[in-house]
Regions:
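Transmembrane signal-anchor/signal-peptide helices with a preference for the extracytoplasmic
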Residues: 41-53
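Conserved phosphate/anionic-ligand binding catalytic regions in large, soluble enzymes, centered on
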Residues: 17-38, 144-162
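Amphipathic alpha-helix face/heptad-repeat signature
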Residues: 30-34, 62, 69-76, 115-125, ...
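Amphipathic alpha-helical interface segments
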Residues: 80, 84-153, 157, 169
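Amphipathic, well-ordered alpha-helical segments in soluble domains
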Residues: 11, 34-41, 83, 122-132, ...
Length: 210
């Protein structure tokens, strides 16, 4: 089943159910995609306007990046579900003999690594989404300024949610050095892009209330 082809109602119903997917990872990717789409909307409302003719080429370039990024995040909704399948299978392997225990440990380590790769990719995409939101807030139509702020907040939420999805998997890794490296990668993205998202929000809020 391709989760991205579900209706909004069906996706949310499945998210609320006991089904293994979608879960927090797929939901985070979808929220990030929505944030990027909001930014793209700001761009599309800006192009073709005489008032923003000087920014036309730059906005068109931002729109191209946003469209590609949205599609990337949409694909990550399904990728997160696909990554859960081998992880669930690994937990179900027998471990009665030393050989079975060794095999289960190896398979589980590989599955956990794969389960971390997707949320890290979502985080990377959300960082780009926050950068785009900052540009749209600065250069886009003032009539859609609030949407640029929403774009930053959506991507921020998805970024933080994905960091939690990294942490729940690294916590279970027996290779603690590798786990620490993945946690550090996530922490670096949070440290750099959460302040930028907050800056975009504060700037937008101040301009709207001026």
């Amino acid at each position: 089943m391709d989760l991205t082809q579900l209706s909004c109602e069906d996706f949310l119903s499945r998210l609320a159910s006991k089904a293994p997917a979608p879960g927090g990872g797929g939901a985070a990717a979808l929220v990030g995609a929505a944030g990027v789409a909001l930014g793209n909307m700001v761009g599309n409302l800006t192009t073709g306007k005489k008032k923003y003719a000087a920014e036309e080429e730059e906005i068109l370039a931002l729109n191209a990046r946003a469209e590609a990024l949205r599609k990337r995040l949409e694909a990550l909704v399904q990728a997160d579900a696909d990554a859960f399948t081998p992880l669930a299978a690994a937990y179900g392997l027998p471990r009665e003999t030393p050989e079975q225990q060794a095999r289960k440990a190896a398979v589980l380590a590989e599955a956990l690594d794969g389960a971390c790769a997707v949320p890290l990719d979502i985080m990377d995409a959300c960082c780009e989404g926050i950068r785009l939101a900052a540009d749209y807030a600065e250069k886009g139509s003032v009539l859609a300024l609030s949407d640029a702020g929403c774009a930053a907040l959506f991507c921020k939420a998805a970024l933080q949610a994905s960091a939690l999805n990294v942490a729940i998997n690294t916590k279970l890794m027996t290779d603690r050095a590798h786990a620490a490296a993945l946690d550090e990668k996530a922490a670096r993205m949070l440290a750099e892009y959460l302040p930028l998202a907050d800056e975009v929000y504060q700037s937008v809020a101040s301009r709207l209330r001026a």
